[in-house]
Amino acid sequence: MPSPTASKCFWIRLQQLRFHAHHGLLPEEATLGQRFVLDLECAYHPPSEPWTDELSHTVSYAELCEQIRELCEQRRFKLLESLADAIVERLRAEFPKLEYIRVCLHKPSVPLAALLDEAAVELRWCSETWPNSLASS
């Protein structure tokens, strides 16, 4: 387990990942679907062995995208909070070297009487070894 005081930390950010899915409370949302936008930020400490230019030392952002896309297209959620939680749990299971995950899930087309640009939910998870000072930034 890496030391929380390690001097190096890699951050991976995927911004504005767009997908069409059928999440939401309303029957129309289940039938028609809509666009969702996701921002992902995750971090890990590098391995203690000497760094090489190999994918095994990092987390593939292509695989991160694929895991998120697969989950969003194969399951239906009524709540953005439930979808955000499922994404975090999937990424924790598939990428055990991740020590910090932040998911911000945007729903641009909100079926409300009020005028707004979007609704969004953010969920942050950090391992017990993750420094608290970094988790709140």
Per-region residue spans from a language model:
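N-terminal, polar/charged subdomain of small-to-medium soluble alpha/beta proteins
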Residues: 1-137
